[in-house]
Amino acid sequence: RDVAPSRGLGDVYKRQDIIFTEHERIEVIPMSEKITVVALGHRALGTTLPEQKIATKKAAKAVADLVEAGNRVVISHSNGPQVGMIHTAMNEFGKTHPDYTFAPMSVCSAMSQGYIGYDLQTAIRAELISRGIYKPVATILTQVVIDPYDDAFAEPEKIIGRVLTEEEAETEESKGNFVTKLADGTYKRILAAPKPQKIVELETIRTLVDAGQVVIAAGGGGIPVLPQNEELKGASAVIEKDLTSGLMAEMLNADMLMILTSVENVSINYGTPDEKPLEHITVADAKKYIAEGQFGENSMLPKMEAAVSFLEKGIGRTAVITSIDSALAGFQGKTGTIIE
């Protein structure tokens, strides 16, 4: 994946910081005051490095469409398969290197933010430049404070990592970790998924947004941390990405929260003959459907909850849930599930 520069590139490396090619220049682009927070779902990034490279180019087109339409864009993303792969890799390395200290989940989360952010910002920058838009794109390593007394710690349910044998599961439990038995008789580790309370780097994100930069932040819901005196200590947990995205949109006073997933619309009575896609609905409608149990806990429920929370804490806001291919149409109100 890494590329060594060739001596034949000429003026491509004209400036010492090698950020701009010869034809590029920084331009001040007139923008509206609209801020849109875009949350990329786990299927928007693939499950392998080659898939991720392709997927981020697709995501970059959606982001560039929104920038071109006059938005200040902040992007968050899932890290579901990625953080699990990193965690597994660190554990496997530790087995063959006994002196190696196992990487905690908070560190794995930070690693995932770095390498996903790298691919995203590279793809977004390239897509913007191809359209004649010269805007800085930055990834912010983002910590999110959680509540140590959150009920989620009593009932961990987020599955991570590879399949474990019964012996490996017992070893994990002896370390104080939680595991669950799957339907096929194998095991996997599970983590608590507490709600986000505070985004530590919020003012850094706000400063870059106000400066007109495209910002990637709160990847994977953020690195879960707990305040201990002057320090922030990493927590063995994962945070629901959509809830953090909603909180970030709320605290940035964004105009729109756009959650991009694998389907065009949210549906009620999903998977039944009475399935019905939702188009324009109110917050009251959304709360009613949530109360009815219309949405899966690890699927549409956190998305709808994030949308409702964002909308209830501001005036004139819009939430959109749609597919990545329909991002611009969703922004324009032409498709997707639009909640106001």
Question: Language-model segments: which ranges?
Answer:
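Single conserved hydrophobic/aromatic residue that forms the stacking wall/gate
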Residues: 1-16
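Intrinsically disordered, low-complexity serine/threonine-rich segments
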Residues: 9-11, 23, 249, 257
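Short, positively charged and aromatic/hydrophobic N-terminal segments
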Residues: 17-27
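C-terminal catalytic "cap/lid" subdomain
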Residues: 30-340
